[in-house]
């Protein structure tokens, strides 16, 4: 499902070297399912975009490092969403942009590029996508839905909001002491 969403929303705000919606999907997938699934999702989205949308290999080089590091940073921080965002920014904005240079210069024959040509665009796109992902995931966390998604997907749940609400829940009604029913 994440692959389908990633492919469908990828044309939004997309110019060569910038695809903020891809970073939104990478971070969300990393938090929901972990680094390996996020890496697989980024690879599948990149290949589909390259095959059917004519996107250059930037679809892969600009996604896989950030997707994986986003999940690694999220797990290493024991569930801090901001660390997942920083993992995406570092992985895509720095590593992905530097790897993109030889791919585009030597394999695709692009001229006039230097090693940092894609860095400003990649960092800008990851910041935009990272902000969107952070807002989205924080909203899910505050409502307890993030933990429910993670549980249903079989991922490790780090969400403290979920644990607090589960501890204070009335076993008969399922509502916490602070709950309001409207």
Language-model segments: which ranges?
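Loop-helix junctions at membrane interfaces
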Residues: 1-182
């Amino acid at each position: 499902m994440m692959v389908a969403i990633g492919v469908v929303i990828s044309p939004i705000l997309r110019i060569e070297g910038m695809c903020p919606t891809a970073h939104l999907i990478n971070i969300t997938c990393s938090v929901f399912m972990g680094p390996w699934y996020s890496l697989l999702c980024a690879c599948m989205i990149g290949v589909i975009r390259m095959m059917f949308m004519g996107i250059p290999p930037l679809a892969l080089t600009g996604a896989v490092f950030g997707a994986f590091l986003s999940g690694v940073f999220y797990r290493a921080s024991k569930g801090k969403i901001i660390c997942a965002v920083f993992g995406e920014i570092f992985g895509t904005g720095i590593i992905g942009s530097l790897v993109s240079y030889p791919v585009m210069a030597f394999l695709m024959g692009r001229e006039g590029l230097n090693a940092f040509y894609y860095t400003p665009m990649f960092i800008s796109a990851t910041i935009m996508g990272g902000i969107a992902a952070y807002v989205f995931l924080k909203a899910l966390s505050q409502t307890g839905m993030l933990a429910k998604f993670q549980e249903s997907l079989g991922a490790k749940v780090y969400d403290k909001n979920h644990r607090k609400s589960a501890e204070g829940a009335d076993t008969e009604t399922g509502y916490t002491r602070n709950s309001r029913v409207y």
